[in-house]
Amino acid sequence: MANRSTETSEAAIRRFAQLVRTGEVEDYSGELRLGIDLGTANIVASVVDADDRPVAGGWVHSTVVRDGIVVDWLGATTAVRNLTQDLEARLGYEFTAASASIPPGVGGATATIFRNVVEAANLDLTELVDEPVAAARVLGMTDGAVIDIGHGTTGVSVLDHGTVVLSVDEPTGGHHMTLVLAGNHGIGYDEAEALKKDPASQRLVQGVIRPTLERMATIAATAL
């Protein structure tokens, strides 16, 4: 991936978010590349051109991954296949391969399952990369640390001249915030999730989830 300035990286991220949200596609020419992120809350597919310019994206809410582990292989495969087919229809382009991101520090068995999911969706896997490392590439980082707070886990990767020298992943994320809110207020999970995302409730929510946030900070501090 070509190096980007911080401003260019942030613009690309904002544009990709808009493409995912609206379903729009950019004009393109030449070869396109597909990336798959199997997350705890969502499965996201991204498409870029040869210059790493965002062209399209898609997502689906999913519960097939839990704390970085695939718990529903068939559901994960179906979701990846459906996302790919939707992008192909919108772009008029056929994908035969994809790269995928995995939680940092996972064992070989988990990595193999992620690989099998992509390949079962009729895609050749070109690369399997740690999620924080994928983020570092987008940001053009070669040295430093990336902290990835997901729905199910908090991951930390440390890079030295582009090489990963440390990678950890611990089961504390947005999902755990929601559980704490649900228990504190005596409400269901879905209602707690909506409360967590409501900007008007930010002050109320922050006090309740503070211990979870501190746990995430401890994970990062211990890794670093």
Where are these regions (language model features)?
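A structural feature that tracks compact, well-ordered secondary-structure segments
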Residues: 155-157
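Nucleotide/phosphate-binding catalytic cleft detector across ATP-hydrolyzing
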Residues: 1-40, 44-149, 161-170, 174-224
